[in-house]
From Swiss-Prot:
Keywords: Acetylation, FAD, Fatty acid metabolism, Flavoprotein, Lipid metabolism, Oxidoreductase, Peroxisome, Phosphoprotein. It comes from the Eukaryota. SUPFAM superfamilies: Acyl-CoA dehydrogenase C-terminal domain-like (SSF47203), Acyl-CoA dehydrogenase NM domain-like (SSF56645). One of its GO terms (cellular component) is peroxisome. This is Peroxisomal acyl-coenzyme A oxidase 3. Its cofactor is FAD. It is found in: Peroxisome. CDD domains: AXO. The gene is ACOX3. One of its GO terms (molecular function) is pristanoyl-CoA oxidase activity. It is an enzyme of class 1 (oxidoreductase). Coiled coil: none annotated. The modification N-acetylalanine is found at A2.
């Protein structure tokens, strides 16, 4: 391993080209190669290099600077590229189970090239595929083979035109006909059309369609998933009774064809029901493998968490790209200085450090969290596949649902805010489309909305926590969960007695300080939210009204504080484990502390309101600690970016290239733009067709 770290394996981690970034790279307190190996592992680094090299050397993936593709051409190109990924077969189904994190790595690599490509591949292979795998049974395994041979192309159809977040109001129906042993899939009207479904617009042949299941006697058993063929696999023409189309151009991710579908009494075989959670006999009797409704609900929620957990990873990859661009720019862009003769890199300014370095720390913390949560989800899926119907399995589903529901908002919002900060931190050059920050901002934007509106998802998490507290108050139950994310709440009366007692900045430079504060904050917000909820109910509000009245100032911050605590806790434990190389402990500790304290600082008002903070000193120490950590990480920033940044071809930003030749790269890219030096094709409109001043002025 040592020879690899020191450059013995130059093919795996080649040296960066010399240039203006050399000075910062020389100042780093650690070896970026050693950190890359510790963070990813040699096998994963080789996997990433294989993917990136294949894309860079394949003409189908060639970049076209300045090209404005038509919507139709972009969709075609994205599909061809998605098909090529299957031809490369970077990751077999067997490998997915042997090394689950390679799934996330593949998605991140594709997303770094183009978010539309990652989304298209993800929806077909992981979201559609995992829905069948986790919700279906042996009779559906043939679909898995067809998915990875690309004999069919899939999508996940839950949302409707008039309902998205409120899944209980979904109106597509599936009535069982025992005479023919078929389900009749039907959209009662256009408002019940499946809508916003990725891959459905032009390419999907099959959909996992969620519909309300009815058995004879009009007894409804709630939402269930069905495999429904929507297009002929040979002609891509709609199947009988299916109206399917594309919803049009979006603000971003336009390589992905989002679509709609209506079903007019479409008959599908009884076996089309994905029946792991519930089934219908040939005679029309509904049977469920879960006797307890709560267990059934928890398992169902967990099986639907795939896309939300994946979105966390998709969001973080966008932040990786944006921060890599902005920090390399900041290390080479010189403006002003202590004398008129000397200009210094803008990264030397505390303001630039404060704007960007917390997002660099967020990348490391959230990336680790997304991987750990993905592995937790794999554990849940394996339990479902093995037929585990234990109470622990159901509770694991509820806990993962709560964590996924809050981590998607945290990751997507952090990324959206971070990309905007990066865009502004790069000044006017950041506004040039060729530097990619605008594209990243638009492509990340839907992460805040699809698979659940962020603010509504946070209510799922706060409801989970409130339910645990109610169970404890009413039944004396302990706070316990399979992943131990809530176990600390058992000590909440004692935690609420604690105060912030750190008096110096030096004592604050550890994520353990923020961990203690976060535990107090979650306990405080949980108690306050619970009391507020009960107060509203005693005042005559219904449960629905009471929860809505509590959400803005109580439930929302509770959910965010809880997931931030979980991220901080996991990253803190990760960087303080004994296996961390001594040469990496300091920089990883600073990243952990910076993310924790920076995140905590946004809750300062609540910490004061609840009495954990008192006096001016607490807030001042927190602010000063964040600035001190930014200053300490400033010289490591470029090396930390080198660990997370993809090759220049993938990054695709003249101002973010690894050689640091900011102006040469930008000038060259501008001169290569199509028609950059040509006069406008409409030049006669100025030179020949002069305006007759006042000719259109009203004579009245």
């Amino acid at each position: 391993m040592a020879s690899t770290v020191e450059g013995g394996d130059t093919a795996l981690l080649p040296e960066f080209p010399g240039g203006p970034l050399d000075a910062y790279r020389a100042r780093a307190s650690f070896s970026w190669k050693e950190l890359a190996l510790f963070t990813e592992g040699e096998d994963m680094l080789r996997f990433k290099k294989t993917i990136f090299s294949a894309l860079e050397n394949d003409p189908l993936f060639a970049r076209s600077p300045g090209a404005d593709l038509s919507l139709e051409k972009y969709r075609e190109l994205n599909f061809l590229r998605c098909r090529r990924i299957f031809e490369y077969d970077f990751l077999s189904v067997e490998d997915m189970f042997k090394s689950p994190l390679k799934v996330l790595t593949l998605i991140q690599c594709l997303g770094m090239y183009d978010s539309s490509l990652a989304a298209k591949y993800l929806i077909h292979s992981l979201v559609f595929g995992s829905a069948i795998y986790s919700s279906g049974s042996e009779r559906h395994l043939t679909y898995i083979q067809k998915i990875f041979r690309m004999e069919i192309f899939g999508c996940f159809a839950l949302t409707e035109l008039s309902h998205g977040s409120n899944t209980k109001a979904i109106r597509t129906t599936a009535h069982y006909d025992p005479a023919t042993e078929e389900f009749i899939i039907h959209s009662p009207d256009f408002e019940a059309a499946k809508f916003w479904v990725g891959n459905m617009g032009k390419t999907a042949t099959h959909a996992v369609v969620f519909a309300k299941l009815y058995v004879p006697g009009d007894q409804c058993h709630g939402l269930h998933p069905f495999i429904v063929q929507i297009r002929d696999s040979k002609t891509l023409l709609p199947m009988p009774g299916v109206m399917v189309g594309d919803i049009g151009k979006k603000l971003g991710q336009n390589g992905l064809d989002n679509g709609f579908a209506m079903f007019h009494k479409v008959r599908v075989p009884r076996q089309s029901l994905l029946n792991r959670m519930g089934d219908v006999t040939p005679e029309g009797t509904y049977v469920s493998s879960f006797k307890d409704v709560r267990q059934h609900f928890g398992a169902t929620l967990g099986s639907l968490s795939w896309s939300r957990v994946s979105i966390v990873s998709l969001a973080i990859l966008n932040l990786k790209l944006a921060v890599a661009i902005a920090l390399r720019f900041s290390a080479t862009r010189r403006q002003f200085g202590p004398t008129e003769e000397e200009e210094i890199p803008v990264l030397e300014y505390p303001m630039q450090q404060w704007r960007l370095l917390p997002y660099l720390a967020a990348i490391y913390a959230l990336d680790h969290f997304s991987k750990s949560l993905f592995l937790d989800l794999m554990e849940l899926q394996q339990g479902l596949a093995s037929g585990d119907r234990s109470a622990r399995q159901a509770e694991l589903g509820r806990e993962i649902h709560a964590l996924a529901s809050a981590s998607k908002p945290l990751a997507s919002w952090t990324t959206q805010q971070g990309i905007q900060e990066c865009r502004e931190a790069c000044g006017g050059h950041g506004y040039l489309a060729m530097n990619r920050l605008g594209v990243l901002r638009d492509d990340n934007d839907p992460n805040c909305t699809y698979e659940g509106d962020n603010n509504i998802l946070l209510q799922q998490t706060s409801n989970y926590l409130l339910g645990l507290l109610a169970h404890q108050v009413q039944d004396g139950a302990c706070f316990r969960s399979p992943l131990k994310s809530v176990d600390f709440l058992d000590a909440y009366p004692g935690i609420l007695d604690q105060k912030f007692e750190v008096s110096s900045v030096a004592d604050c430079l550890d994520s353990a300080v923020a961990l203690a504060a976060y535990k107090w904050l979650v306990c405080y917000l949980l108690r306050e939210t619970y009391q507020k909820l009960n107060q509203e109910k005693r005042s005559g509000s219904s449960d629905f009204e009471a929860r809505n009245k509590c959400q803005v100032s109580h439930g929302r911050p509770l959910a965010l504080a809880f997931v931030e605590l979980t991220v901080v806790q996991r990253f803190h434990e990760h960087v303080h484990q004994p296996c961390v190389p001594p040469s990496l402990r300091a920089v990883l500790g600073r990243l952990s502390a910076l993310y924790a304290l920076w995140s905590l600082s946004r809750h300062a008002a609540l910490l004061y309101r609840g009495g954990y903070f008192s006096g001016e000193q607490a807030g001042e120490v927190l602010e000063s600690a964040v600035l001190a950590l930014c200053s300490q990480l400033k010289d490591d920033a470029v090396a930390l970016v080198d660990v997370i940044a993809p090759p220049d071809f993938i990054l695709d930003s003249p101002i973010g290239r690894a050689d640091g030749e900011l102006y040469k790269n930008l000038w060259g890219a501008i001169l290569q733009e199509s028609k950059a030096l040509e006069r406008a094709s409409w030049w006669p409109e100025f030179s020949v067709n002069k305006p007759v001043i006042g000719s259109l002025k009203s004579k009245l």
